[in-house]
Amino acid sequence: MAGTCPMLSVGLVEKDTNGDALWVWCYPTITAELRELLLRKCSLTGENDVIHTFVFGQFRRTWYYITTTQVQDPTALSKVTHFSLVLTAKDFNPEKYAAFGRVLCRTYMKYGNPARIMEGYISVVTNGICQSEENGSFFTKDYDAKKAYLAGSVKDIVSQFGMETIILYTGLMLKKRVVVYHPHIEALQEFTRTLPTFIWHRQDWSILHPYMHLNHDELEALKACTGYVAGFTDLKVIDRPDIYDVFVNLVESEIIIAPHAKETMAMGKLHKDIGQLIVQSAGDPDKSDGRVIKDISQKTKEILTILASLRPDEDGKSKITLEILKERHFPPPTESFLYHLAAAEQMLQI
């Protein structure tokens, strides 16, 4: 178990009665850059008094999960009003780390000693369990990665955006940069974490950056990614077309394609057919979210099969060229979509 545990570190941020928030403890260690980012994310350091009990995000391939608690009397923590328990890990699993974070928070509230947190952390790293009669138990085996992938609702997204969902699907398929805005972090995280399910064949949640600030270091790290889904609570992000191809305003239920991306995102009959299939499947009250994801995935598979059939030989090793696509006389939007999809799937001869 020790060799495969994806957890990287555990840390503590405390807010004292003077209103100061300080990074007070960490095990084993984290970089100064990551510590600065986590202080920004924990909701104890800003002017805003809104406390977010749980947030998660990603920075340079490290996932962070922050559980924040108000200190209740009586407690072993004197002069502390709130604290954040910060876990970093290599895997995406909000439910797993929220549950473990709650257990460690109760432990710290009771004993006020980081050594007790370290005991629980090491127990999970080595044995996959952290058991306590008073503070609750946690078992790693209860939290499957696939469950985390399927936790959001595709049906809710389609219900909100209808046929415009095809813009999201196209952007994700072509590995475009999708930026999402909502002022409430909880709504933002719920929506953004669901988007990668539209491209289930990749099962790649590393594209997800659900909680971003308009901070230089964060934006530079984001720009280094090929395609992504990034969530912002600051509407000023709309004035940064250099970081998005598709902009989603969740409050207004509006999806905007950036001018520079309109050509590669041109829609045709193929897109209309896919859009109708998505809307029809998601609108069926008898279908679960899992079933809708399967329907979308099946359609994706059909498109990828068409793409694979365009390869000049049958060994699957040769690449598709623009000339091959032109020979097929596809309508321009379909040709463009297949061309850029071949590039995204690394099937294109450049």
Question: What annotation goes with each model-predicted range?
Answer:
Residues 2-350:
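Acidic, Ser/Thr/Pro/Gly-enriched alpha-helical scaffold modules and adjacent low-complexity linkers
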